[in-house]
Amino acid sequence: MSDTPLKCTTRHVRIFTATVEDNGELKASSDKLTLDLDPDNEFEWDQPVLAKVQQRFAELVDAAAGTELSDYNLRRIGTDLEGFIRQLLQAGELRYNLGARVLNYSMGLPRTPETL
């Protein structure tokens, strides 16, 4: 494997074929994936919601076991995970961080009981 990790980057999901070293640097890995969720802190993550996303990530990785570790397969996992995050937001389990640096509502305007 090369020294440059493969990566998938969506708006709220980053997946790397790498591990994070003690110094915070990424080290390429042919058998480990690192998940970076919501790097811009657009959402408020409660522990149960975070656990659901991590579980879904594990399911997607398990489903892809035995396939080539390629850009395409990483993008499929990342895109599916991004869709899952959208579902959580639409179901009201995840909410926007109103204290975020920028409020761009990238997954649609916030939903309130009055607008449902």
UniProtKB/Swiss-Prot annotation:
Catalytic reaction equation(s): a plastoquinone + NADH + (n+1) H(+)(in) = a plastoquinol + NAD(+) + n H(+)(out); a plastoquinone + NADPH + (n+1) H(+)(in) = a plastoquinol + NADP(+) + n H(+)(out)
Pfam families: NdhM (PF10664)
Top-rank lineage group of the source organism: Bacteria
Family: Belongs to the complex I NdhM subunit family.
Single GO cellular component term: plasma membrane-derived thylakoid membrane
Function: NDH-1 shuttles electrons from an unknown electron donor, via FMN and iron-sulfur (Fe-S) centers, to quinones in the respiratory and/or the photosynthetic chain. The immediate electron acceptor for the enzyme in this species is believed to be plastoquinone. Couples the redox reaction to proton translocation, and thus conserves the redox energy in a proton gradient. Cyanobacterial NDH-1 also plays a role in inorganic carbon-concentration.
Enzyme class: translocase
Assembly description: NDH-1 can be composed of about 15 different subunits; different subcomplexes with different compositions have been identified which probably have different functions.
Keyword DNA damage: no
EC number of this enzyme: 7.1.1.-
Main location, first listed in the record: membrane
The protein, known as: NAD(P)H-quinone oxidoreductase subunit M
HAMAP family, per database record: NDH1_NDH1M (MF_01352)
Membrane topology term: Peripheral membrane protein
InterPro entries linked to this entry: NdhM
Keywords annotated in UniProt: Membrane, NAD, NADP, Plastoquinone, Quinone, Thylakoid, Translocase, Transport
